Amino acid sequence: MTTITITRPDDWHVHLRDGDVLKDTVRDISRYMGRAIIMPNLIPPVIDTESALSYRERIIAQGPQGNFSPLMVIYLTDNTSAEEIHKAKASGHVYAAKLYPAGATTNSDSGVTSIDHIRPALQAMQEAGMQLLIHGEVTAHDIDIFDREKVFLETVLAPIVEQFPNLRMVLEHITTADAVEFVTNAGPNVGATITAHHLMFNRNHMLVGGIRPHFYCLPILKRNIHQDALVKAATSGNPKFFLGTDSAPHAQGRKESACGCAGSYTAHAAIELYAEVFEAADALDKLEAFSSFNGPDFYNLPRNTDTITLKKESWNVPETMAFGGDEVVPIRAGEAMLWKVI
């Protein structure tokens, strides 16, 4: 197969940042994505409807390509009220609220310290039909970083699912076979996004032969048995699993340092990266559902009606890309890609 035409895909988890870098991140995400769920972990975080709508206007002001639509998210804190949830839902532009356990990832210090603090907000979300997006890791210092997702499933997520059975929730950027099993066996209100980099790489790619900081992300890359489970889930056709890049840019100097930031940039070639994974798994026929159908179906939104075409054509990823006044090193920098959007 040398060309594939699929319904225009969406990205159900992306970081665009803010300020002078927006022109670059919006350029890349809108190149062929129809919609994207925009992460709210700015400084300061997007904690209410007003700040979400303001952020949306800043994104649109960059002149995204095509008919790209940013779908906004508010950042849950210990103080998020039920009233704010209903206000956000009524705005027509806020599609979800994000649960960051405090300290779990980049700019999550204002996140939730205990689920007990957000029960009224979760109840309001269940009533309003708003999605809960979850960074599924515990943050206790005595829990090994490679085990934090598994422990979260057992100690935090399972009780939420039990206590709020009608709350639709997305376990984002899953990284373990445990998460695949949890989502598969949960009811129809639990879905998951899977990133391209967690499908393509495991912790050996990051650590063997030298530390490669551009593979460092959170949740951290796991061993290959978990990578294999993710590939099987993504290519299975199960509608619970869908595309979410978690493309998370940092300036080159903030990655290549003694204390580098977590995040991998993939928005420059997202669907091309996924296409390589699906081709290697002999599952190109499942790419459209994963990329273009399962996400909007889970969110109860219409599927896109136009298409994009990928061609089996080699092209080289730039070594660096513009990122405001800095540069970002994209995933597969300097390497050849196998598929190209034409």
From Swiss-Prot:
Residues involved in Zn(2+) 2 binding: 98, 135, 173
Pfam families in alphabetical order: Amidohydro_1
Record pathway: Pyrimidine metabolism; UMP biosynthesis via de novo pathway; (S)-dihydroorotate from bicarbonate: step 3/3
Catalytic activity: (S)-dihydroorotate + H2O = N-carbamoyl-L-aspartate + H(+)
GO BP annotation list: 'de novo' pyrimidine nucleobase biosynthetic process; 'de novo' UMP biosynthetic process
EC class (word): hydrolase
Cell wall biogenesis/degradation keyword on record: no
Keywords associated with the record: Hydrolase, Metal-binding, Pyrimidine biosynthesis, Zinc
Binding locations of Zn(2+) 1: 13, 15, 98, 246
EC number: 3.5.2.3
Residues in coiled coil: none
Positions carrying N6-carboxylysine: 98
GO MF entry, a single one: dihydroorotase activity
Residue positions of the active site: 246
Domain of life, source organism: Bacteria
NCBIfam families on file: pyrC_dimer
Name assigned to this protein: Dihydroorotase
Organism encoding this protein: Photobacterium profundum (strain SS9)
Organism placement in taxonomy: Bacteria, Pseudomonadati, Pseudomonadota, Gammaproteobacteria, Vibrionales
Record gene name: pyrC
